[in-house]
């Protein structure tokens, strides 16, 4: 009976300190033999509360693990929080709320990454339960964090638990995929709707269609996407710009050199195929005509990739 009473008191103490936003006091408590129960209490509260609840038990659990030097568990708690927020993101009623949830989700992924990088490379992983009740239902809970005892029976799904090993590279990929979607939402607001199909591989053609080749390149590198469409579209831009240059040069062949340079410069500036050069911070300081800068842009990126032979074949096929 005394053990049950002690357990109840410890549980009440933990929840009371959390509700009073006294996390520092909780972390300073010298309750060595009760640390496992404190961790179970915080984990239970985090699992059964809304990811937007205050106090945020996921953040408290993260601080608890960090204070004990357990960066693996700290990362796992924030990864779970990010996925809970992902459910809210899919069901967000408006673009503004979706962006707000997605920003919080990205922050949780980033905190998870920061915890994992503190570990040796061989230990930068954790196990994640794919049968998480909230993720399985696809609906956020309306309940606030539970108070009181946590020793009541909690039904578990039938069958063995489905565990996934999550590595640092996996979290980084999810983080960059989310940032990419947030960036694309500025141009394509329909991506904010949960019913809109979204795959990371779709980001590259969307950036290319928007003449944002810098973003397309960085996204392809971060997410390790094939760049076939990038080099194919870029080669076509180069060809069209060079053809337009020679056509303009022939048109103004008999004009005064000063006027010819002025006319051709104005038309190059207005050429829609040169829009990607105007958007790129890299090409802003490059001298030369638009087609010369475009070919240089292609060459620089071709030399920067590890699959130059494959992409040279794509460029050659476009030029034939």
Protein language model regions, located:
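Extended alpha-helical assembly domains of large eukaryotic scaffold proteins
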Residues: 1-320
């Amino acid at each position: 009976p005394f053990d049950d009473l002690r357990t109840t008191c410890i549980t009440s103490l933990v929840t009371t300190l959390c509700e009073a936003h006294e996390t520092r006091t909780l972390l300073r408590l010298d309750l060595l033999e009760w640390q496992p129960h404190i961790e179970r209490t915080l984990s239970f509260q985090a699992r059964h509360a809304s990811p937007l609840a205050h106090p945020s038990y996921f953040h408290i659990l993260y601080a608890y693990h960090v204070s004990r030097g357990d960066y693996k568990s700290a990362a796992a708690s924030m990864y779970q929080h990010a996925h809970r927020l992902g459910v809210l993101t899919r069901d967000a009623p408006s673009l503004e709320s979706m962006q707000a949830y997605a920003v919080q989700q990205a922050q949780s992924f980033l905190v998870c990454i920061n915890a994992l990088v503190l570990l040796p490379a061989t230990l930068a992983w954790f196990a994640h339960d794919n049968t998480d009740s909230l993720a399985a239902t696809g609906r956020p809970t309306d309940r606030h964090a539970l108070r009181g005892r946590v020793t009541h029976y909690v039904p578990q799904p039938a069958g063995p638990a489905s565990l996934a090993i999550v590595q640092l590279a996996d979290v980084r990929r999810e983080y960059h995929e989310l940032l990419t979607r947030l960036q694309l939402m500025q141009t394509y607001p329909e991506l904010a709707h949960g019913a809109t199909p979204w795959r990371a591989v779709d980001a590259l053609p969307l950036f290319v269609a928007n003449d944002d080749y810098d973003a397309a390149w960085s996204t392809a590198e971060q997410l390790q996407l094939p760049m076939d469409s990038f080099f194919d579209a870029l080669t076509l831009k180069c060809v069209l710009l060079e053809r337009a240059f020679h056509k303009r040069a022939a048109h103004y062949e008999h004009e005064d050199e000063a006027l010819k340079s002025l006319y051709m410069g104005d038309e190059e500036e207005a050429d829609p195929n040169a829009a990607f050069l105007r958007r790129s911070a890299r090409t802003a300081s490059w001298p030369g005509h638009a087609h010369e800068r475009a070919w240089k842009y292609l060459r620089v990126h071709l030399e920067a990739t590890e699959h130059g032979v494959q992409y040279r074949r794509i460029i050659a096929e476009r030029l034939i």
